[in-house]
């Protein structure tokens, strides 16, 4: 839940700044056309900027150490395994990195299939068997091959646009209703209007998070299927079972955990970016 509230708070700050900037620029957001342009620019713009800098952000945020020259047999095996799987999946070799964390996790990020980063935690690298790590790597390579970074960015852009547009349309309706019942016809006033927009942004933002999480869970099942093809179904099941027995994740930011192997648990499954590990194992066994 903390991840969701943090995401909503960040979006609220962005929308507040966006509203001020658009007012300074004189963009009329009182009409449907102007409002839609405003919503699309900031809805998709923010999502694609995040995608464009995703590799850089991942390296800085997680302290990823990209392997350029393997220092030992473990790193050499890691790079060779990703290279083999990338060739099988028909994509350009991603950058391979390690980040220091005791959690059992890995993630993929990057602006495109042929410009990606696959990173694993030190806890996973030295706490799982080679077969299990191979399956985890195959899962991340499948995310890249499936174009999940771009897909989730497009979905995020659409729901961002919906949140910005819908919140201001509803706020406008409320403002007009208040004005029609006000002798002076002034409506809510600037500060009250902004407060209403803020609350509506939060409410619609929660709905948007549920939608994005739903599509993220679907992509996880697809990545599991892809990993089963690249590394073998039994290896993937064993890897998920090992993750199920490990400690709960907590170090990875939400922007990267959506394409990680092991997602954070939530009180509400609707807000989870990953299906429960038990369901993922059951889906693989049934396939």
Curated annotation (Swiss-Prot):
Its cofactor is Zn(2+). Zn(2+) binds at residues 139, 143, 220. One of its GO terms (molecular function) is zinc ion binding. Binds 1 zinc ion per subunit. It is found in: Cell inner membrane. It is an enzyme of class 3 (hydrolase). The keyword rRNA-binding does not apply. It is a multi-pass membrane protein. GO terms for biological process: proteolysis. CDD domains: M48B_HtpX_like. Its EC number is 3.4.24.-. InterPro entries: HtpX_protease, Pept_M48_protease_HtpX, Peptidase_M48. This is Protease HtpX. It comes from Shewanella halifaxensis (strain HAW-EB4).
């Amino acid at each position: 839940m903390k991840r969701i509230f943090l995401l909503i708070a960040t979006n609220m700050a962005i929308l507040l700044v966006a509203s001020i900037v658009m007012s300074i620029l004189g963009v009329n957001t009182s009409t449907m056309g102007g409002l839609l342009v405003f919503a699309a620019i900031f809805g998709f713009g923010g999502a694609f900027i995040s995608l464009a800098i995703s590799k850089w952000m991942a390296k800085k945020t997680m302290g990823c150490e990209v392997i350029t020259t393997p220092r030992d047999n473990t790193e050499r095996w890691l790079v060779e395994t990703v290279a083999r799987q990338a060739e099988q999946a028909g994509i350009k070799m991603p950058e391979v990195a390690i980040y220091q964390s005791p959690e059992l996790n890995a993630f993929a990020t990057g602006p495109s299939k042929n410009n990606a980063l696959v990173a694993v935690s030190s806890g996973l690298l030295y706490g799982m068997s080679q077969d299990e790590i191979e399956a985890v790597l195959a899962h991340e390579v499948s995310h890249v091959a499936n174009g999940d970074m771009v897909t989730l960015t497009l979905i995020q852009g659409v729901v961002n646009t919906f949140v910005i547009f819908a919140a201001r349309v509803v706020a406008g309706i409320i403002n007009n209703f208040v004005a029609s019942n006000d002798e002076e016809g002034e409506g809510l006033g600037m500060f009250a209007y902004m407060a209403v927009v803020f609350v509506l942004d939060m409410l619609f933002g929660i709905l948007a998070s549920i939608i994005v999480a739903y599509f993220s869970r679907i992509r996880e099942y697809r990545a599991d299927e892809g990993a089963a093809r690249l590394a073998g179904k039994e290896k993937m099941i064993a890897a998920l079972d090992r993750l199920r027995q490990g400690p709960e994740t907590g170090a990875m930011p939400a922007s990267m955990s959506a394409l990680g192997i092991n997602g954070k648990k939530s009180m509400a499954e609707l807000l989870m970016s990953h299906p429960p590990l038990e369901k993922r194992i059951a889906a693989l066994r049934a396939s």
